[in-house]
Regions:
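Short Gly/Thr/Asp-enriched flexible loops that form oxyanion-binding sites at enzyme active sites
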Residues: 66-80
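Catalytic core of DAGKc-family lipid kinases
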Residues: 21, 79-84, 90-192
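ATP/nucleoside-binding phosphotransfer catalytic cores, i.e., glycine-rich phosphate-binding loops
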Residues: 223-299
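Internal helical hairpin/lid segments
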Residues: 191-243
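Short hydrophobic-aromatic micro-motifs
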Residues: 128-141, 189-198, 203-204, 218-221, ...
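ATP/NTP phosphate-donor binding region
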Residues: 1-58, 288, 295-299
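Glycine-rich beta-strand-to-loop/alpha-helix junction loops that act as flexible
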Residues: 12, 61-63, 88-91
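Short glycine/serine/threonine-rich phosphate/pyrophosphate-binding segments
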Residues: 43, 65-70, 95-96
């Protein structure tokens, strides 16, 4: 195999920041050319370069944010549906890797030769792709304020936990949701502290992996947070657990969120503000190598 037909993009300082040399060695053994990021935005630039050069198999070593940057670059080069993605978990929470059944760096490299290739849904928001989730609402600094330790334990939910901690002084936003697909159309209007849109992640009941091949988002609208001194993680389970009156659950292929005021959106950790945003799925748009524990139809 010609080196260059397989390319790995690595964030050498993601996670604990001690994986770079191991990744270089394993990548060479698997025939991957290695491109490394040096700062913010490099993942997107390198992803676009890979797309423009016609790379057919790409590996990304970093966290969910690095993967998101690379996918945005591939999308900008109109190459998202022309490439096979290999995920090498090198971040803190590694939510996408977990959903794909990829345990660690060595396991990720093992799968570059023998992992099953599945065609997975890609979420789109504001014209940009995301794989794990898009979260709307909460104060703008909730995502960046989430601690590394919290992200390690809860991943994307760290944003929700931090938001709940700050929601004591946050009155919520007047929102309208218009939802389509999944057997019909629906709408919701009212005051909410957050809207959780999951592609690889479910936010209700027991959480965990969502169905990434059904063309639908799992959507949860959280109206308010529990009062009192309830522990934050218990609050998460109370909020998102089955039968909670303050949470509304939908499944939809397209979700439009509209507000009179700017709303903060966190798309796999990438922050933007809009008073109107539409999220939709591109069904089975990205070929991804998965581990043997990946569940195409999770319960």
């Amino acid at each position: 195999m010609q080196v260059g037909s397989r390319t790995l993009i690595m964030n050498p300082v993601s996670g604990t920041g001690d994986h770079a040399e191991l990744v270089r060695q394993l990548a060479r053994g698997k025939g991957f050319a290695v491109w490394e990021t040096e700062g913010a935005g490099d993942g997107r630039a390198l992803g676009r370069r890979a797309g423009e050069e016609g790379v057919s198999e790409i590996a990304v070593c970093g966290g969910d944010g690095t993967i998101n940057e690379v996918l945005r670059g591939l999308n900008a080069a109109d190459h998202l549906d022309e490439v096979t993605l290999n995920v090498i978990p090198g971040g803190t929470a590694n939510l996408l890797a977990g959903a794909l059944g990829i345990r660690d760096i060595r396991h990720g490299f093992d799968l570059t030769d023998k992992g099953e290739i599945r065609s997975l849904d890609v979420g789109m928001a504001d014209g940009e792709p995301f794989m794990v989730s898009c979260i709307a609402g909460f104060p703008a600094d909730a995502s960046t304020a989430a601690s590394g330790e919290l992200k390690e334990r809860l991943g994307t939910l760290a944003f929700v936990v931090t938001g709940i901690q700050e929601a004591v002084e946050f009155e919520g936003l007047e929102l309208r949701l218009d939802l389509h697909g999944g057997g019909g159309s629906d709408s919701w209007e009212g005051s909410a502290v957050t809207v959780l849109v999951g592609n690889a992640r479910r936010f209700i009941e027991e959480g965990g992996q969502a169905d990434m091949e059904d063309g639908l988002f799992d959507v949860a609208v959280v109206e308010d947070v529990p009062a009192g001194n309830l522990a934050v993680e218990a609050a998460i389970h109370r909020l998102l657990g089955e039968g909670t009156d303050s949470v509304h659950h939908f499944r939809a292929a397209q979700v439009t969120v509209t507000s009179d005021d700017p709303v903060t959106f966190s798309r796999d950790g990438e922050i933007a503000e809009h008073d109107r945003a539409t999220m939709y799925t591109r069904p089975q748009a990205l070929d991804v190598r998965v581990g043997p524990e990946y569940e195409p139809r999770p319960d």
